[in-house]
């Protein structure tokens, strides 16, 4: 028999979402500012309502049942719509409005000063939270923890980061496309040699750990050629790799998007750029579409629409 929503305490759905996010009764209780016992009692009520265990206890934490997994997206959508409904008054008087962004650095560092000024000019009492883009950022957008993401995707046909492979719930807009370049210290010995593939591969490389991987489309292209680069150092992001490439006493080289020239100028890094020594077809596989990403439920959210427009305008002016 179909159950009536009026007989369900809606606070239980918030508890259910937090349990799905945390996979722990204790952590969910901490986020709700209640005792673990209270969360356990709520979970018992939810199990009775859905006639399903919902979660199974394991040494690694709570593991959702197939029914719980099937409900995850609908639950996140429902909670997000509830938050938007409660935020309606803030569209007229935007006190306490929050902006949650996940962005690739140094891209955000180039534009953040201008973007934050625009946000505070329009919403003087807004708060802004920026996190680095990482392997969990798409899930954070889906869960409603991030309003909008700004990052590069890949173009190589074998890449896991193709725009065509984004989850169906994610909308996106490509703001610009960029080709990675090679960045070397001004006195790097490679600059005294003919710039070709052999020179490029002769020296140790700095790579970045992207989406929990130390390799990317560049390494796929090299593999197709029967070649491989020596990755001597892996770092969390482009800004760290550029900083290290600029330091004396080593022959490391970095590969980073061409837009990083703006970052280098801003921080006066003594770096010289060289194009990747590949043909046009190979370079096409390395093209990086820099993309805004948001959840479909936010496509008409006034705050998100305004933020997208602001970032779009800044990109055209700064990049």
From Swiss-Prot:
Entry-linked SUPFAM superfamilies: Periplasmic binding protein-like II (SSF53850), Winged helix' DNA-binding domain (SSF46785)
Q: Spell out the molecular function terms from Gene Ontology.
A: DNA binding; DNA-binding transcription factor activity
Ordered alphabetically, the record's keywords are: DNA-binding, Transcription, Transcription regulation
Q: What residue ranges does this record give for the DNA-binding region?
A: 25-44
User: What CDD domains does the database record attribute to this sequence?
Assistant: PBP2_Nitroaromatics_like
| InterPro entries attached to this UniProt entry | LysR-type_TF, LysR_subst-bd, Tscrpt_reg_HTH_LysR, Tscrpt_reg_YidZ, WH-like_DNA-bd_sf, WH_DNA-bd_sf, YidZ_PBP2
Name one matching Pfam family: LysR_substrate
Enumerate the spans annotated as HTH lysR-type domain.
8-65
Family designation = Belongs to the LysR transcriptional regulatory family.
Matching entries from HAMAP family are given as: HTH_type_YidZ
As for what it does, the entry says:
Involved in anaerobic NO protection.
- The name on file for this protein is HTH-type transcriptional regulator YidZ
Task: Recite the lineage of the species.
Answer: Bacteria, Pseudomonadati, Pseudomonadota, Gammaproteobacteria, Enterobacterales
Q: Which gene encodes it?
A: yidZ
């Amino acid at each position: 028999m179909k159950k009536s929503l009026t007989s369900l305490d809606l606070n239980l759905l918030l508890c259910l979402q937090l349990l799905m996010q945390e996979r722990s009764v204790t952590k969910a209780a901490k986020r709700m500012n209640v005792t673990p016992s209270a969360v356990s009692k709520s979970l018992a009520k939810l199990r009775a309502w859905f006639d399903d265990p919902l979660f199974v206890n394991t040494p690694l934490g709570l593991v959702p049942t197939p029914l719980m997994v099937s409900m995850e997206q609908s639950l996140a959508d429902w909670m997000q719509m509830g938050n938007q409904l409660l935020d309606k008054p803030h569209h007229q008087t935007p006190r306490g409005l929050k902006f949650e962004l996940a962005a690739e650095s140094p891209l955000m560092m180039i534009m953040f000063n201008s973007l934050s000024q625009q946000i505070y000019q329009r919403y003087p009492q807004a708060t802004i939270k920026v996190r680095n883009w990482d392997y969990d950022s798409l899930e954070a957008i889906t869960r409603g923890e991030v309003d909008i993401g700004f990052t590069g995707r890949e173009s190589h046909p074998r890449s896991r980061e193709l725009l065509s492979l984004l989850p169906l719930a994610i909308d996106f807009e490509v703001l610009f496309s960029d080709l990675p370049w090679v960045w070397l210290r001004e006195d790097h010995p490679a600059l005294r040699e003919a710039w070709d593939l052999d020179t490029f591969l002769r020296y140790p490389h700095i790579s970045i750990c992207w989406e929990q991987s130390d390799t990317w489309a560049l390494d796929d292209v090299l593999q197709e050629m029967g070649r491989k680069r020596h990755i001597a150092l892996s770092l969390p992001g482009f800004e760290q790799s550029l900083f290290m490439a600029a330091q004396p006493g080593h022959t490391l080289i970095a590969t980073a998007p061409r837009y990083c020239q703006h970052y280098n100028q801003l921080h006066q890094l003594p770096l010289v750029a060289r194009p990747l020594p590949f043909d046009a077809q190979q370079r096409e596989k390395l093209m990086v579409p820099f993309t805004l990403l948001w959840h479909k439920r936010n496509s008409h959210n006034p705050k998100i629409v305004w933020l997208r427009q602001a970032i779009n305008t800044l990109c055209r002016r700064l990049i």
